[in-house]
């Protein structure tokens, strides 16, 4: 018996037994020995058996060394152990001593067979496998012991190969590389065959259940037939589906595609089944599986439509720490944060208004141009953006989707609805620094500040009364003068719209219109032009303050003074705070002049703080 020591691949014999390893012979030496007559061979074998009575010691390093012997072995060439010729008998003892000196662990094997082994062990363990007994030595050695050694070594060889497949790697190209590739190919083939067998059995059971359900629906006319078919399919799906590796294996994909094609061909060939619609096996299995559905795509790949996959939608994982709002991307959360920080890094270069996003600034820039391509079909009013036109169309339709929960008042726009809700909260966060009056909205405070600096940009054409807001002017004309809410109904010069656009933006820039010759931005024409006061009538000298006034209208008025176009009182009848120009310059009162300077300083301070 041959035992393997726990130190690795070094075999050893049990205690009390003396064994000897047969010498490894080259093919040339074996062919030379076979040409001799049987008598010489038997004589040489008897001599060799007598010489091998001593124990043989060698190491695994000696075995793993490459064979440097030439094809024709001369007598003086040293060999590890050779008993082929009689000329080597004299040099056997020094070679044995040299082998014993190089030995790291003793190996003692007893065997009398010299013929090569019929079994080819192409690995690092082939040196330990003794060959079968020849007919000449069968009478000397006992066949049962040799067969036992052969069987043990063979089984041990296969066991080591199964436990240590990486031992196919050998230094100096001693082991065959093709054996490792063959082993890997066989392993992959066995795995694929096992998966294919599992898949085929599952497909067969599924087809059987589907055939049973189809036969029930075809043969039975009772309404319970469909319920029985669904129950059968659900029972077949109660068994766990294929493993994830089987679903991704190419064998499983090809089998599923072939089964689907066969089912389609069967449905096309059978004319009696054309009237009923039967789902294919792939679709039935997909519909029965609710948690994770997989269906083959037309390109042959498997599309995962599970809720957590990319096709099913990304989970929202980014939440705002301030308000708790959840976003599906970090970019959206970054865009949302300026709502809480109040940062408005994108500033308009024309009016100085700030915005949180660059896209909002781009939309805002349109109002500074004269382009209004979007026109209302009902009233003919034009707008810069289509969204503004859509919001305006709600006025004609009477659609007010935003309704207050407290008072039931409806609004066309969401912004107006939010501003109205602040009136019910009771909180007035915007307070005037001059009179300590508080407001719910910031734009109400902005309009209130005009009362302190005597700025009323919106003036009535009938009575010349000034207003801070265009809304107040429309309300005044509608109630007092019984004129429509839209100022366009009046016969006004075309520069009125320009003046209205200018005065609407005047509070935003403190430096606009300070001097009569200063250029100010004009939103309607896109150019720089001096501010135009529409309420100023023509001068008595024949020069007009507004080029829009025709000279014919100038000539028909007397040169003695101003004459209002609508037949109202002349400008000297109006108070000093009127928007009309006076012919005779009045001497300002010292107290009024001091009050005016104080109001001007307050307005500059307010504008510096707000804007």
Curated annotation (Swiss-Prot):
Q: Which organism is it from?
A: Drosophila melanogaster
The keyword Nucleus belongs to this UniProt entry's keyword annotation: yes
For this record, the Gene Ontology CC terms, alphabetical, are: axonal growth cone; neuronal cell body; nucleus
Where along the chain is composition biased (Low complexity)?
A: 30-47, 283-298, 305-314, 581-602
Query: Its quaternary structure?
Result: Found in a probable chromatin remodeling Brahma-associated proteins (BAP) complex composed of at least brm, Bap60, Snr1 and erm. Within the complex, interacts (via N-terminus) with Bap60 and HDAC3.
Domain-level remarks: The second, third and fourth zinc finger domains are necessary for repressing gene transcription.
Its BP terms in the Gene Ontology are: axon target recognition; axonogenesis involved in innervation; cell dedifferentiation; negative regulation of DNA-templated transcription; negative regulation of gene expression; negative regulation of neuroblast proliferation; photoreceptor cell axon guidance; positive regulation of gene expression
UniProt biased composition (Acidic residues): 86-98
State the family named in the UniProt similarity comment for this chain. Belongs to the krueppel C2H2-type zinc-finger protein family.
Annotated function:
Zinc-finger transcriptional repressor. In larval brain, involved in the maintenance of cell fate of intermediate neural progenitors (INPs) that derive from type II neuroblasts. Restricts INP developmental potential and dedifferentiation by interacting with HDAC3 and the chromatin remodeling Brahma-associated protein (BAP) complex. Restricts INP proliferation by regulating neuroblast specific factors such as prospero, pnt and grh, and by antagonizing the function of self-renewal factors, such as klu, dpn and E(spl)mgamma-HLH.
Q: Where is this region: Disordered?
A: 1-104, 246-314, 505-602
> What is the predominant subcellular site recorded for this chain?
nucleus
Where in the sequence does UniProt note compositional bias of the Polar residues kind?
A: 252-262, 513-547
The top of its lineage is: Eukaryota, Metazoa, Ecdysozoa, Arthropoda, Hexapoda
Instruction: Name any one GO molecular function.
Output: zinc ion binding
Gene inactivation effect: Results in abnormal expansion of type II neuroblasts and in ectopic expression of pnt and grh. Simultaneous RNAi-mediated knockdown of N partially restores normal neuroblast numbers and prevents loss of pnt expression. Simultaneous RNAi-mediated knockdown of erm with either HDAC3 or members of the Brm-associated protein (BAP) chromatin-remodeling complex brm and Snr1 further increases the number of type II neuroblasts compared with the single knockdown. Simultaneous RNAi-mediated knockdown of both erm and the ETS protein pnt restores normal neuroblast numbers.
Q: What is this protein called?
A: Fez family zinc finger protein erm
Its subcellular locations are: Nucleus
Keywords tagged on the record = Developmental protein, Metal-binding, Neurogenesis, Nucleus, Repeat, Repressor, Transcription, Transcription regulation, Zinc, Zinc-finger
